Design a protein with these regions (language model features):
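Intrinsically disordered, low-complexity N-terminal regions enriched in serine/proline/glycine
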Residues: 5, 25-26, 99, 103
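Short, surface-exposed glycine/acidic/tryptophan-bearing loops
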Residues: 9-64, 78
Length: 107
């Protein structure tokens, strides 16, 4: 699997999603503000051939990463060869301490 590259626009959208989750007190792939992650990406002008999203709530990046890698579905997104770009968002203030959003796209 090739390393993922950071995408600036995807980083902005992932950060917005994390902030939206804290502000509106939810933990879901579907935002009451923006809809699905795929709808949200399109609203912000991000085009893709394939896309995915991981969410984690944890006190540290290390613990969040470990929990994502120990989850089959989340691990598949991280290691998915069709994804070549990532955006990561982090927001503080949730019941978990921090919310982590990983958005993946393949172009």
């Amino acid at each position: 699997v090739a390393p993922l590259q950071f995408d600036t626009k995807l980083m902005e959208v992932a950060n917005l999603k994390a902030q939206d989750m804290v502000k509106n007190n939810y933990f879901s792939h579907t935002s009451p503000t923006y809809g699905s992650p795929f709808d949200m990406m399109k609203q912000f002008g991000i085009s893709y051939k394939s896309a995915g999203e991981n969410l984690a709530g944890n006190s540290t990046v290390e613990k969040a990463h470990t929990s994502l890698m120990n989850s089959e579905g989340h691990r598949k997104n991280i290691l998915n060869a069709s994804f070549n770009y990532i955006g990561i968002g982090i927001a503080e203030g949730s019941q978990y301490g921090k919310i982590y959003v990983q958005m993946f796209i393949g172009k």
